[in-house]
Amino acid sequence: MRVAVVGATGMVGEIMLQVLAERNFPVTELIPVASEKSVGKEIEWKGNTYKVVGLQTAVDMKPEIALFSAGGETSLEWAPKFAAVGTTVIDNSSAWRMDATKKLVVPEINASVLTKEDKIIANPNCSTIQMVMALAPLHAKYDIKRIVISTYQSITGTGVKAVRQLENEYAGIQDEMAYKYPIHRNAIPQCDSFEENGYTKEEMKLVRETQKILNDNTIAVTATAIRIPVVGGHSEAVNVQFENDFDVNEVRQILSNTPGVTVQDNLETYSYPMPIYAQGKDDVFVGRIRRDESQPNTINMWIVADNLRKGAATNTIQIAEYLVANNLV
């Protein structure tokens, strides 16, 4: 199968290539794609050397699948061009997520909505993916009424420039900054730009995407997204109010039985999720599970995942695997 990776030289693109190899995705021809400044560069993949090509060249090669991680503007312009030649596009940007004609997919939750006609498929936001992975099975059992979420997000979600800023600040070097403020020894209560309602785009993604993935616009969601000087993954403090009461041990059991979710919740051994543990792994880790004693039918939990893997690259490739396994591509 001919597979194009659009944004192959970027942070998520590199992880996509890594995950494709790890999961032995059936690639017969790899097409690494990037901006014009990277065309001609060579990358190594599974013992072979490939030259990076431009977008039009990749379209002309008519790959069966194109995995996009090149930003919204690139996706809006080029995803339809790939789709027009028969390529199925799986896009990591926010460009198509809230388009009513496009599917927003977390395979463990709603892959069954996909059909052969879906030529542009949206990958959800990283912070949304890890939250709904934990909440979807609980929604099915107890019916979620309201979610209050605060995120503590890795600088890797911003990209290479942000990682470089942290490394430079740690070393005492003044250089180009990805953020308006220092990130070393700091917490910045802004992820992405602000909308008119005072929330950031990142916060509103959590609201809108959660409702779309769970197929329930009655769920109330409010979010605060914070950038912290961590590289291993995103962490989330999540407070969930259900319509129905629950048993905490049953919640743990449901989560333990959910594919792609690992429960780390042993207070005696100080076992709970942390980015340093989640980094490089594909599971979503859930812990600090406890009843909210201030409000009926409400639970607190702490959710952590590697935002570059399950939050981006791995989820994208899992969608591609589903398409292949079900002859949808």
Please identify what each model-predicted range represents:
Residues 1-183, 218-220, 284-285, 289-295, ...:
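N-terminal Rossmann-like NAD(P) cofactor-binding subdomain of oxidoreductases
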Residues 66, 155-329:
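Charged docking surfaces used in two-component/phosphorelay signaling
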